Amino acid sequence: MDHAVVRSWSREFSDAAIPLTSSQLMRQHLEGVRLALPFDAAQVLVFDRSKDVHRQIVQVGYPAEVARALAEDFTQNWPSPVWYPVDADDDLPTSISGERDVDGSFRRSHIYRDYLAPAGFLDGITLELKHRGRYVGLANFSSRTLGFYDRSRRLVSAAFATLLAQAISDNARELEAIPPTAHAARVIR
């Protein structure tokens, strides 16, 4: 066997053994999601229970100020502003272009008006990520095309909410910045 081939295999397997950070792993997950749920920009936020805040773990395609507004301002009063679907019986994630344009709707919020729309994002969805019933974070997806997140894409997005929540849960200690020496305790009063 050629010595160069063995060395090449060795490098390939040794590189694969180097663990990815949670951010790198989530970036890979987002790129995988993009194949079935296209987006111009996306962001995954983890809910840090120890500080009662959302923290961005990865974002792709958003200008820095838009990503900051989504991570900090948008999550401050989550789940407000409430999104108002056109069809009240539709339990899929609501898209920006698929919601009613009424007072209090997301399209009239300062997040959309001051950040997303000026950056050219005309449609988007937010997925609430839950693992085993526990809220673990949010995933934001945006498109520059009005009406992009139609019913079929929203249906696909619902499946990815579960997978992204699982990925967050698998890395919870690192993502929530919980010290490895921390232990849970149950207090009964």
Feature-to-residue mapping (PLM):
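Regulatory input/activation interfaces that engage signals or partners
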Residues: 4-20, 24-148, 152, 156, ...
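Signal-transducing coiled-coil/dimerization helices and immediately adjacent hinge/linker segments
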Residues: 170-189
